[in-house]
Regions:
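Conserved small/polar residues in nucleotide/adenosyl-binding loops
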Residues: 238-245
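Hydrophobic alpha-helical segments, chiefly the membrane-spanning helices
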Residues: 249-255
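A helix-coil-helix interface module used to build multimeric assemblies
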Residues: 1-203, 207-215, 221
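A structural signal for small-residue-enriched, beta-sheet-centric alpha/beta enzyme cores
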Residues: 223-228
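Intrinsic disorder/low-complexity segments enriched in polar/small residues
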Residues: 69, 248-249
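Acidic/His metal-coordination segments adjacent to aromatic residues that form catalytic metal sites
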Residues: 233-236
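Residue-level micro-sites within transmembrane alpha helices that shape
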Residues: 111, 246-247
Length: 255
């Protein structure tokens, strides 16, 4: 019998090719910091709600912080056989504090866990992108001012069409990036709801406090529908950039 978490009915080991295909750790290791933040908020909520003892909560939180330090110090070993970031962290936590680590998964699924991780990841990245956009706009605006009367060819259909100034051309990017900035800042409102507590898809019978865990993680409120909470990934589209700047990089080669 396989020792995989989901392989109770399997009698043989999984094919190596399927192992490679199924493992997401090569991508979701980036979620490690957020995964630990989510776990700490969740276990604190369980203690507040009386689902676990305060002493158990403290032990698990201390263990999670040790795992986080190992990751930050570059000493943590990400294992493909454990598939994803959640199981990698939980496995290491079990090694550090013992079987009590299993209580971390009470009233929670990897489904609501990863959905919450992704939102925290996006919120941080979007805030960083907005700062970069503003810096870029300042640089472009200054360059536009310095080159307000520099003549350059304007293109339509990848062909030279009309004379324009370099300043005018650079300011078009300032406007483009401004729309990106508005779109990104607006998306933060839609990301400001926590999926945590939705469990696999239908919630949990444990007396949890989703409002509390949401506030611990900095969210305004929990998501209203548990199915939507674990299944929606439209939030990933919020960071899609405008393709214009990439498209225009081809223009100089068409002259």
């Amino acid at each position: 019998m396989t020792n995989k978490m989901w392989g109770g009915r399997f009698s043989k080991a999984t094919n190596e090719l399927l192992e490679d295909l199924n493992a997401s750790i090569k991508y979701d290791y980036r979620l490690a910091k957020y995964d630990i933040e989510v776990s700490i908020a969740h276990i604190m909520m369980l203690a507040k709600s009386g689902v676990i003892q305060k002493e158990e909560c403290n032990l698990i939180v201390d263990g999670l912080k040790k795992v986080q330090k190992e990751i930050s110090d570059g000493k943590f070993e990400f294992k493909k056989k454990l598939e994803d970031i959640h199981m990698n962290i939980e496995s290491r936590l079990t090694e550090i504090i013992g079987p009590i680590a299993g209580k971390l998964h009470t009233a929670r699924s990897r489904n609501d866990q990863v959905a919450t991780d992704i939102r925290l990841f996006l919120i941080e990245k979007i805030n960083g992108l907005v700062e970069l956009i503003e810096e870029n706009q300042k640089t472009l605006s200054q360059q536009a001012l310095d080159n307000f009367d520099a003549i350059m060819p304007g293109y339509t259909h990848l062909q030279i069409a009309q004379p324009i100034t370099l300043g005018h051309h650079l300011l078009s990017y300032v406007e483009l990036f401004n729309r990106d900035k508005l779109r990104l800042t607006d998306s933060l409102k839609r990301l400001d709801e926590s999926p945590l507590g939705a469990a696999a898809m239908a919630g949990t019978s444990y007396p949890i406090d989703r409002e509390y865990s949401a506030k611990l993680l900095g969210f305004n409120k929990p998501m209203s529908n548990s199915i939507d909470a674990v299944s929606s990934r439209d939030c990933l589209l919020y960071t899609s950039p405008s393709p214009r700047d990439v498209e225009e990089s081809r223009i100089p080669s068409s002259a």
